[in-house]
UniProtKB/Swiss-Prot annotation:
Alphabetical UniProt keywords: Ribonucleoprotein, Ribosomal protein, RNA-binding, rRNA-binding
Keyword flag RNA-binding: yes
Provenance organism: Chromohalobacter salexigens (strain ATCC BAA-138 / DSM 3043 / CIP 106854 / NCIMB 13768 / 1H11)
Family: Belongs to the universal ribosomal protein uL22 family.
Keyword Ribonucleoprotein: yes
Name recorded for this polypeptide: Large ribosomal subunit protein uL22
InterPro entries: Ribosomal_uL22 (IPR001063), Ribosomal_uL22_bac/chlpt-type (IPR005727), Ribosomal_uL22_bac/org-type (IPR047867), Ribosomal_uL22_CS (IPR018260), Ribosomal_uL22_sf (IPR036394)
GO BP terms in the entry: translation
Domain of life, source organism: Bacteria
Stated role: This protein binds specifically to 23S rRNA; its binding is stimulated by other ribosomal proteins, e.g. L4, L17, and L20. It is important during the early stages of 50S assembly. It makes multiple contacts with different domains of the 23S rRNA in the assembled 50S subunit and ribosome.
GO cellular component: cytosolic large ribosomal subunit
Stored Pfam families: Ribosomal_L22
HAMAP family: Ribosomal_uL22_B
């Protein structure tokens, strides 16, 4: 049985979050939490929080054993992009794209 946790609209790009997601996909949750704790990337902190939420959901709602859990699926999709303007010289303006992503983590027993 799979248990899910989702974070929608995280303020980081999906491309950067996928680099971190690939590190923990398929690993036992204890090992995945260790990998995320020592990763210097901003996305690691966000993914770790979602993974901890999925673990808590599995334990509280379904009574699963934490030691038997593994990250079965981790999916990072693009979210809404906020468009901002950066003024430049001679009356011009550049667009700044502030990207967001949706992170879905599913944990299952081995």
């Amino acid at each position: 049985m799979e248990v899910t946790a989702k974070l929608r609209g995280a303020r980081l790009s999906a491309q950067k979050a996928r680099l971190v997601a690939d590190l923990v996909r398929g690993k036992p949750v204890a090992e995945a939490l260790d990998v995320l704790a020592y990763s210097p990337k901003k996305a690691a902190k966000v993914v770790k929080k979602v993974l901890q939420s999925a673990i808590a959901n599995a334990e509280e709602n379904n009574g699963m054993d934490i030691d038997e859990l593994r990250v079965s699926t981790i999916c990072v999709d693009e979210g809404m992009t906020l468009k901002r303007i950066q003024p430049r010289a001679k009356g011009r303006a550049d667009r700044i794209l502030k990207r967001t992503c949706h992170i879905t983590v599913k944990v299952a027993e081995k």
